[in-house]
Amino acid sequence: SSDRAIVRNNSFSSSGDNGIKVASSDDVIVDNNTLSSNTDYGFYMSSSDDVTVKSNTISDNNAGVYVSGSDDILLFNNSVNDHDSYGAYLTDSKRLKIKQNEIKNSVGDALYLSSNCDLAFIDNNTIKNNGNSDSGRAVRFFEVDESTLYNNTIDSNDYSGVVITQSSKNKIIKNTIKSNGKYGIQILNDSTKSANNTIKDNVVNDNTNIGILNHGIFTTILNNTIKYNENDGIKVASAGARTTIDGNNLIDNEGNAVSILANNVIIKSNIIDGDSSKVAVVVLDSNSVIIENNTVEGGLQGIKIQNSLYFE
């Protein structure tokens, strides 16, 4: 191991492997390097804790950043652009801090956290123009719990903005998620369900499909502005039982403002202005749904309930 090393003000390009590799070394600082046109990752790290990676320019590699089995890592103020695969792929690493980075023009997922990257805090990043029309999420969580996505700009990515799969107790707060090529935010299940995730105080607008699509259980969707999406504003799929939709402002989404296909959903205190919407609130094949204290204006219909029981 090489603990407490500093790698600063270098240029590494056109290698047959990675630009910089840190392995089994703690308390390393990687600062203000240019890592470009390398065959694998620009920056690669494994089994190293308390590493700071800041102010680097990482571009035109096969992929940008890889972190595995490394806890308490800070990725700060890096420019990660123009990669054929991932922008940043992080796995099995706890308490990550990912702050004020720019991630653009990755063909694969721009920022992918997987396999127990719990307790991450991701804030004030710009994630733009990534993916293609079939794949490549701007932000992707898989098997990640108790992490926070806060005040990021997720804009004009060709696929979905934020996708959370088999992940629980995460918070998506105060982000701008706009003009993405599929969903704004999507919560999915896999072999286990996603549960107890919170989507709060975000602006989700002008996405090509649904603004927020939820398959997770016990999801809270609170105080978001969801507007001008080309399909539904919010859709809760049949797996998304016990979702709460509270205090949101839904404006002119082109499908239904809110579509519910799950049981035990609460829809309350939302403002729905649906001049471009089909139905303000549609409930299909769902039982024990509560709809209360909402303000609805416009749309072809106010509330539509079909094949459903036990309403309040």
Where are these regions (language model features)?
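Short glycine/acidic-rich loop motifs that flank beta-strands on beta-rich extracellular proteins
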Residues: 16-24, 39-46, 62-69, 84-91, ...
